[in-house]
Every structure is written in structure tokens, then in C-alpha cells.
Amino acid sequence: MQHFFYKLILSYDGTCYYGYQKQPQKITVQQTFEKALKKMTHQNIPTFAASRTDKGVHSQGQTLHFQTTFFLKPTHFQKTLNYLLPPDIRVRQMNFATPNFHARYSAKSKIYQYVFSKKPLNAFNHHFQIFADKLYFDKITKALKFIEGTHNFFAFTSETQPKNFSKTIFQAFLKETSHKYILVFHGNGFLKYMIRFLVGSLIEIGKNKLSLEQFQAMLLGNTTKKATLLAPSKALVLKKIFY
């Protein structure tokens, strides 16, 4: 029986979901997507994603792949899935994939963004950003440069026994618009809670609660101090996956 391989880009508002990955008794993005996929194909089809985003984290560029004996042109597949999915999950793009493509293991790098509002939050934006209340962004900009390069990020994760705490950050910078400050992180991979702990430390730097020297020592492994402030998940967005 012939199998067909599909790759798609998924965007979602993570507010109402208990993260991306399936969990018992929890409503997640993966569970919701696979439910729509089963309704369409009448098959139990496992899907594989590039990133397992946390509860409340959003995506504009999550990448998935799956295989099935069900055939439909990707454009028609995309249209039908979007009809079956809730409005806070959208298939942005869908194509055929090669049999050796893997959404997670074929990924070369990822971009995440963390969004601060310059003004107090309102009813229409409070799910997607946090208020930049009395933060010194000149200090945060200096600290971002320390993050670039290959480091042991043990101080910035809840994990205790991964194979390797080393990650390479190609770019870490601040982007400013008329209404927002956006922290951009482009790296070859990220540990559990790594970006949120980094952002939490940057917030502490911006409030003069953590020095640049202390932050750099944490990145260099010259201290036993670990990050303690976990930034809220709602302002974090998975922007893009590179292959």
C-alpha cells in the first residue's frame, strides 16, 4: 500500500492549550490537530513536530510531518483541515515531503521571539505580550550580546540530565517598533524553559536586580547560581524553523 508524506506549517494561539505535545487529560495543540486529521482521514495518524512549545506559548511557524495512505493534494488537504480545526489553530502552508524528512531531526535552527508592550496591556493584546514596566533596555541590549555563541545553558533550564546542555545561539538582539520591544533568539536548539529563563534574567537585569557580570558568569559556568525568574509563556512565539 502506498504511503504519502506531508509537511505543514502550523500557527496557533496557545492561550487555551496545555502546550503543544499530547498529554493525558489535557487539551493540547497536537491532540486537537490529530483529532481533526482523524476526522478527515478516518485514520489514527501520529504527527511529529519541530518544537514542543510550553503551555500558553504561541506559534507562527511550527513545522509538522506525518505519513498516511490517504491521498489528497496538499492545497485541498490544507483547506479541509482548516475547516475542521478551531480558529486558533491554522495550517498556513502544506506540501508533500520526502520520506526522509523529519520535522524535528531535520531542523537546522529555530527563531523565537519574546514580546514586550510599551503601553499597559488591554483586552485585545494581553494574551500575546507583557508590559515593559520600568525596564532599562540599554542594559538588556548589552546582555543579549553575551548570549550569542556556544554556551552551557545549565543555569537556564529546568532540565537536570539531558545529554548536553550546550547550545549555539547565532543571534540574540532587540527589535523595537512604535508599540513594542521584541527580543529575538535564533539558535540551533533550546532546552526546556531556556528562553523563558533567559528572558527572566534579562528582566532582572533591566530592573537592576541582576548585574551584567553575574549574568555573564552564569553563561560561562563560573557560578553555581541558576536563573530563578521564569518569564510568562504568553509573550513567547515560535517564529520560524529552518531546514
Curated annotation (Swiss-Prot):
Catalysed reactions, as listed in the record: uridine(38/39/40) in tRNA = pseudouridine(38/39/40) in tRNA
Any single GO BP term: tRNA pseudouridine synthesis
Membrane spanning stretches: none
A single GO molecular function term of this UniProt record: RNA binding
Binding site for substrate: Y112
Disulfide bonds: none
UniProt keyword annotation of NADP present: no
Keywords: Isomerase, tRNA processing
InterPro entries xref list: PsdUridine_synth_cat_dom_sf (IPR020103), PsdUridine_synth_TruA (IPR001406), PsdUridine_synth_TruA_a/b_dom (IPR020097), PsdUridine_synth_TruA_C (IPR020095), TruA/RsuA/RluB/E/F_N (IPR020094)
Active site: D54
Pfam families on file: PseudoU_synth_1
Its EC number(s): 5.4.99.12
Enzyme class label: isomerase
Superkingdom of origin organism: Bacteria
Gene3D superfamilies: Pseudouridine synthase I, catalytic domain, C-terminal subdomain, Pseudouridine synthase I, catalytic domain, N-terminal subdomain
Ion transport in keyword set: no
Similarity-based family: Belongs to the tRNA pseudouridine synthase TruA family.
Quaternary state and interactors: Homodimer.
Task performed by this protein: Formation of pseudouridine at positions 38, 39 and 40 in the anticodon stem and loop of transfer RNAs.
Protein name: tRNA pseudouridine synthase A
The species this protein was found in: Onion yellows phytoplasma (strain OY-M)
Organism lineage string: Bacteria, Bacillati, Mycoplasmatota, Mollicutes, Acholeplasmatales
Gene name as annotated: truA
